[in-house]
Amino acid sequence: KLVVSYGKRAHVTLCDGTKIWANAGTVLLFPTRFEDKKREIYVDGEIYIDVTPNPEKPFIVKTSDMGIKVLGTSFYVSAYRKDAEKSIVLVTGKVEVAASNGETVRILPNDRFRQSADRYVVDKVNVEDYGSWKDGQLSFRNTELSGILKQLSRYYNVKIVYDKQRPITCSGKLNLD
């Protein structure tokens, strides 16, 4: 079990060589050794994962309300239990997502799968916009201020409020270290 403190990030290499970067406030459950014919972990939070390929042992990432099956790929998962929306952004390879409504959805590189309740949408994104936290920065490109403040609030575990009279969008980089 890995629990990442607020204001911190962590990196772990699993017994099969799979590498995981975990963001602040993330809980990651994984075995010391993978048994049987599958490799399975559970995440409540945000990770970037680079899965070591093994066609004979699929890799499964479970969250509170979706499952992700891969053979060898790299992708981001944002699935904090408290958030209404969960997302997956695929960097390389292919993954199959078991959505909460029972459907299985295959996504490709540069696809983002977003799920709220029993609804989901898949759209194209720039993957570079999603993983800056693992390198100690938060990068934003035309992002609503409310989204930026939500990420900062989660990272540092503090409540941030502002007057939302009109939407404000921002671009830039924030150093987390």
Which sequence ranges carry the predicted segments?
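A residue-level detector for the "anchor" residue at the start of short, highly conserved motifs
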Residues: 1-177
